[in-house]
UniProtKB/Swiss-Prot annotation:
<comment type="similarity">
    <text>Belongs to the MnmA/TRMU family.</text>
</comment>
<keyword id="KW-0547">Nucleotide-binding</keyword>
<dbReference type="InterPro" id="IPR046884">
    <property type="entry name" value="MnmA-like_central"/>
</dbReference>
<dbReference type="InterPro" id="IPR023382">
    <property type="entry name" value="MnmA-like_central_sf"/>
</dbReference>
<dbReference type="InterPro" id="IPR004506">
    <property type="entry name" value="MnmA-like"/>
</dbReference>
<feature type="binding site">
    <location>
        <position position="32"/>
    </location>
    <ligand>
        <name>ATP</name>
    </ligand>
</feature>
<keyword id="KW-0963">Cytoplasm</keyword>
<keyword id="KW-0820">tRNA-binding</keyword>
<feature type="region of interest" description="Disordered">
    <location>
        <begin position="378"/>
        <end position="406"/>
    </location>
</feature>
<dbReference type="InterPro" id="IPR046885">
    <property type="entry name" value="MnmA-like_C"/>
</dbReference>
<comment type="function">
    <text>Catalyzes the 2-thiolation of uridine at the wobble position (U34) of tRNA, leading to the formation of s(2)U34.</text>
</comment>
<keyword id="KW-0819">tRNA processing</keyword>
<keyword id="KW-0808">Transferase</keyword>
<protein>
    <recommendedName>
        <fullName>tRNA-specific 2-thiouridylase MnmA</fullName>
        <ecNumber>2.8.1.13</ecNumber>
    </recommendedName>
</protein>
<dbReference type="GO" id="GO:0005737">
    <property type="term" value="C:cytoplasm"/>
</dbReference>
<feature type="active site" description="Nucleophile">
    <location>
        <position position="101"/>
    </location>
</feature>
<keyword id="KW-1015">Disulfide bond</keyword>
Length: 406
């Protein structure tokens, strides 16, 4: 097959390209130029879109002896990822920009251009397994990236290859070193590539502006003021601006954010727990399960947040979501209701809920949706009139009182 290897400049995409070549495919390397201001993109080895990354990708392509190109998707990236990121926070949602980039850039813009140019597939370094249209978790549980691929359609997956998904990361680094790739020991990227200094709150503030509001406790008492709800995330403990210690001595966390009124609510850790999720913007879920319950596991964060659940698909014919967003053409006309069999903490509106079926050969990804509401423990799963929450953090971050999104 003729394939396009998406080369980020990291070790995973380098080995993916090498494996595609070794498998006998005709391979070209493509690096995506995503920033309209290259000098504003993170410099150094921890970014994923820097000029150094482009140079690293080119050196790997030269080592492999394959053609190398840089394709400029900066306009698409700004409109579909950066602007979406800002707009989502402005309406009280918490988007995952890496997931959005996969959906709109790597497996829409890149894939569409590749197919138009006569290529058969796109090769990436994602840690996921794909065989005969079945998408599974990667073998390396610590590096599994199937979650951020949950938004892909069956049609897109038919033109995807994930060559490193059956290997653990240390072996990938060894393989890269044996091949003489200079990126063999390059650190993984973790931060948001379009926020070079990692100051998400300042970035959002520069785009959204001051929107003062109140911080209230669960009893409705005003305990502080703030400059904008985008400075908070559900589960956040530090930096709340609370002027005094709580009477009971227990720490307080952000439990809810209402972007419409500008109100941030704080409460105890117990107040973070949810027992149900409602999701829309559904992808890949089998129409045959419509109207009946099925057991699954649901993951709500890229790393962690996996619990067993009982799910069902119900009709949701409205063309507009509760947040006012018009549904896209490839979204299924239903909503997903999930009864969590174990509670989750810090679940956010706007995050992805990715559904799996456990399997000994690697959990099978069934589909995904975007969280639009949650229900409290013991409450029925139904549309909630109260506004949704913003932000989501890993359990470890809650325990340490750190904000995992900032």
């Amino acid at each position: 097959m003729r394939v396009v290897a998406a080369m980020s400049g990291g070790v995973d995409s380098a080995v993916a390209a090498a494996r595609a070549l070794e498998a006998g495919h005709e391979v070209i390397g493509v690096h995506l130029a995503l920033s309209q201001s290259p000098e504003a993109v993170r410099a150094g080895s921890r970014g994923c879109c820097s000029l150094e990354d482009s140079a690293d990708a080119r050196r790997v392509a030269d080592k492999l002896g394959i053609p190398f190109y840089v394709w400029d998707f900066s306009d698409r990236f700004k409109a579909d990822v950066i602007d979406n990121f800002v707009d989502s926070y402005a309406i009280g949602e918490t988007p995952n920009p890496c997931l959005r980039c996969n959906e709109k850039i790597k497996f829409e813009a890149l894939l569409d251009r590749s197919i138009a140019l006569g290529f058969d597939a796109v090769v990436t370094g994602h840690y996921a397994q794909l065989h005969d249209g079945v998408l599974r978790r990667g073998v390396d549980a610590d590096k599994d990236q199937s979650y951020v691929l949950g938004v892909l359609t069956d049609e897109q997956l038919a033109h995807c290859m994930f060559p490193v998904g059956d290997t653990v990361k240390p072996e990938i680094r060894e393989e890269a070193a044996d091949a003489g790739f200079g990126v063999a020991n390059k650190p993984d990227s973790h931060d948001i590539c379009f926020i070079p200094d990692g100051r998400t709150q300042a970035f959002l503030g520069s785009k959204i502006g001051l929107r003062p509001g109140l911080v209230r406790d669960t009893g409705g008492e005003t305990v502080a003021e703030h400059d904008g709800v985008y400075g908070f995330t559900v589960g956040q403990r530090k930096g709340l601006g609370l002027p005094r210690e709580t009477l009971d001595g227990r720490p307080r966390y952000v439990t809810d954010i209402d972007a419409h009124t500008g109100t941030v609510t704080v409460g105890t850790r117990e107040d973070l727990r949810v027992g149900g999720i409602i999701a829309d913007r559904l992808k890949r879920l089998d129409p045959e399960v419509h109207g009946r319950e099925f057991d699954c596991e649901v993951q709500v964060r890229a790393h962690g947040g996996v619990v067993p659940a009982r799910a069902r698909l119900v009709d949701d014919p409205t063309p507009v979501t509760p947040a006012g967003r018009v549904k896209e053409a490839d979204e299924l006309p239903w909503r997903l209701e999930l009864e969590l069999l174990q509670p989750l903490e810090g679940v956010a509106r706007g995050q992805a809920a990715v559904v799996y079926r456990p399997d000994e050969d690697g959990d099978i990804l069934l589909g995904s949706g975007t969280i639009r509401a949650t229900t409290a423990l013991g409450a029925p799963i139904e549309e909630q009139p109260a506004p949704g929450t913003v932000g989501a953090v890993d359990a470890d971050a809650i325990e340490q009182g750190e904000d995992a999104q900032r």
